[in-house]
A protein has these predicted regions:
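Ligand-binding pockets and gating/stacking loops
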Residues: 2-479
Length: 479
């Protein structure tokens, strides 16, 4: 009987579950587990059996699947976060903190427009946001010193030591999304908790780090392929394989004395729930959205990703990051100057982005509100840092360099108090003038929203506990 059961778990080749490593692309599926022997038959764990059973699903292996949920945990609340990551670092002066009274080399080429908040002006290329700014909070005093274009940036981890150029441990600091995945989990057992969309480079998003690769984000770029059943594998056959794995329970109880199998049960059920349940597959399928809704968002890639993010949180994902970039490397918003391709300067580089962003963010907020999702969904728009208060850096006449001393960002939703501006920069937009907001404050606000206790810790490679928020508190003006 054992031989018959195991003969159905056909051998395959698959990628290593630790995608930070290389050189294991041809590892046998059963090689991940230590076998036990019974009557001369090699008997593998239930996890191995299900791994082989599901491995034909367009590359949707069990290691990939088990990254989608947090220890089998499903959150009791429906809270979620959508992070629109403006990769490269948008200019504060040319977006949400204009300086119209200053010389052109400071104020830049754009005009300003009034908003729904009396006395508050923003860039002329954000008219839709200006008209509904009462739904947003602008923060004009974010202190993002130490941040740079690197994996697990300071602004996605809230760890001020997160500078890989000087700190080799920086890549291990877990991101907001990974911590939410571990300590909040998904809002539905068949949905991944932490998803990244439109990822142009690994350096644009935050990873699991010390938490482990199981808390890395699920790459939504590949979702359409991952959830396709290959020819010859029907849902009935997949369900039969699930029954097979359950039949293996009795056998493995006799031969596995390590206790590992009990822990693996949740991995197996997670994999089957996500594939066979159909909920995740349906969530990633934009063709199921009414045409009028798709038309409302539009055909731009960022708009499609925003619609997809709404579908994901609506169906149970708890943290979705959209990489708002058209490029790899440092990112689309890295507007150093027209003579520094491919990003351009403020006029030729930033200006075309703003109307697209304006449409995407306002459509998303309106749609979430109309569906009753906005109070449970915190939407955050930000990049790594601000940009220099003076035009003409690095030999250009129309670009701005990195400037971590002050940054602007915006938030909406989450049941917080909006229709306000928090903090202020100085007259040139180069320094914080009042109410500094730190990455730790932002992290504490996210975890407060998601119900993750601020005294939660994770363990580093030396076995030492580290607080998820070392310095910071929820932004009081929002609460």
């Amino acid at each position: 009987m054992a031989r018959e059961l195991l003969s159905l778990a056909y051998p395959i080749t698959m990628s290593s579950p630790d995608h930070h490593c290389s050189g294991h692309g041809g590892q046998h599926a059963f090689g991940f587990m230590n076998p036990r022997l019974r009557d001369g038959v090699v008997v593998h764990s239930r996890r191995s059996v299900l791994k082989t059973s599901l491995a034909g699903l367009g590359g949707l292996t069990l290691p990939a699947l088990t990254k989608l949920r947090a220890e089998g945990k499903t959150a009791k609340s429906g809270k979620s976060v959508i992070l629109l990551w403006m990769t490269g670092g948008p200019s504060q002066i040319d977006t949400w903190d204009p300086k119209p009274g200053r010389p052109r080399e400071i104020r830049g080429p754009f005009k300003t427009i009034p908003t729904k908040l009396p006395g508050t002006h923003i860039c002329e290329y954000l008219p839709k946001q200006a008209a509904m700014l009462d739904k947003f909070t602008l923060i004009r005093s974010v202190d993002c010193r130490f941040s740079n274009h690197e994996p697990n940036m300071v602004m996605q981890t809230a760890n001020l030591a997160n500078e890989p150029r000087t700190n080799p441990k920086a890549k291990y600091y877990p991101s907001f999304g990974s911590i939410v995945a571990k300590h909040h989990g998904s809002n539905h057992p068949s949905m991944p908790p932490y998803v990244v969309l439109n990822m142009k480079s690994r350096s644009h998003v935050g990873w699991g780090g010390y938490l482990g690769t199981q808390y890395d984000p699920f790459d939504g770029n590949n979702a359409s392929k991952l959830f396709q059943l290959p020819a010859g594998l029907s849902m009935e056959r997949l369900q039969a394989r699930q029954t097979l794995s359950q039949q293996m329970d009795g056998l493995r109880a006799e031969i596995d004395a390590s206790g590992m199998m009990s822990a693996m049960d949740s991995f197996s059920q997670t994999a089957f729930d996500i594939v066979a349940g159909g909920r995740a597959q349906e969530a990633f399928d934009l063709s199921r959205e009414p045409q009028k809704v798709r038309d409302r968002y539009g055909d731009h890639d960022w708009a499609k990703q925003a619609l997809l993010a709404r579908r994901l949180v609506e169906r149970g994902s708890s943290f979705v990051t959209i990489d708002l970039s058209n490029h790899g490397a440092s990112g689309t918003w890295d507007n150093h100057g027209d003579n520094i391709p491919p990003y351009g300067g403020i006029w030729n580089g930033l200006r075309p982005l703003l109307p697209v962003f304006d449409h995407v963010i306002t459509t998303l907020i309106s749609d979430l509100g109309e569906r009753g999702l906005l109070d449970d969904t915190l939407v955050i728009c930000m990049g790594e840092f601000g940009r220099t208060p003076t035009l003409g850096t690095q030999g250009s006449t129309d670009g701005r360099n990195h400037w971590p001393y002050v940054m602007s960002m915006c938030l909406a939703g989450g049941g917080f108090r909006h229709g306000q501006v928090i903090g202020a920069s100085d007259k040139d937009g180069g320094q914080i003038n009042e109410r500094p907001v730190t990455p730790g404050d932002l992290a504490a606000t996210i975890y407060h929203h998601m119900g993750v206790p601020l005294d939660t810790t994770y363990t580093d490679h030396q076995g030492r506990p580290n607080f998820i928020v070392d310095q910071g508190a929820p932004i009081r003006e929002l609460i």
